[in-house]
């Protein structure tokens, strides 16, 4: 018995991007959200999509702050698209934008979406600098402490625990960078 292909054909109708810039240059004070929203705004203007509901906005970033937990949804809400436009994040080292486009195309081919936008964004200018694990443990301990004496004991550990953990662009198992 012959197998029929029920997947729909997919077409990329256009795109938009903001210019590349060196870290700590033109976008030194811009976040991932600022930059992706700007690119999405340009797409909306270019294709007259103001007020339109897209079936999905897919994208993401590799260097993300904890505040970026719902990055694509916040980006979509920051534009003039319909607030009913759905969005989700994904993340793949050196391939977030491409993986987003593949996910959008797959959703269209499978009939889950009619129209989708996809992309990726990253900035090293606004790198997510995290607290060191020792400081994090002291701060969490302060929150859980049952008495002032327990809190004072933990406060005494603060000077030794203060430290900044700067993220590195390397793979955890090999220590090598992909870019």
Model-identified regions with their sequence ranges:
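Residue-level detector of conserved, well-ordered beta-strand and adjacent loop positions
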Residues: 13-14, 91
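Glycine-rich phosphate-binding loops at beta-strand->alpha-helix junctions
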Residues: 61-67
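Acyl-thioester C-C bond-transforming condensing/cleaving domain
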Residues: 2-8, 22-51, 68-69, 76-77, ...
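Short polar catalytic/cofactor-binding loops
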Residues: 15-20
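Short glycine-rich phosphate-binding loop at a beta-alpha junction
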Residues: 53-60, 117
């Amino acid at each position: 018995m012959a197998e029929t292909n029920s997947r729909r054909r997919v077409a990329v109708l256009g795109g938009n991007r903001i210019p590349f810039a060196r870290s700590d240059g033109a976008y030194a004070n811009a976040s991932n959200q600022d930059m992706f929203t700007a690119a999405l705004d340009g797409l909306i203007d270019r294709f007259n999509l103001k007020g339109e509901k897209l079936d999905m906005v897919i994208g993401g970033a590799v260097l993300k702050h904890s505040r970026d937990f719902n990055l694509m949804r916040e980006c979509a809400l920051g534009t003039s698209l319909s607030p009913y436009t759905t969005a989700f994040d994904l993340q793949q080292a050196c391939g977030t934008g491409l993986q987003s486009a593949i996910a959008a195309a797959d959703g269209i081919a499978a009939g889950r979406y009619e129209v989708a936008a996809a992309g990726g964004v990253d900035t090293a200018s606004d790198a997510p600098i995290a607290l060191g694990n020792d400081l994090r443990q002291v701060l969490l301990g302060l929150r859980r402490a049952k008495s002032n004496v327990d809190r004072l004991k933990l406060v005494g550990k603060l000077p030794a625990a203060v430290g900044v953990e700067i993220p590195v662009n390397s793979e955890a198992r090999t220590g090598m960078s992909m870019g």
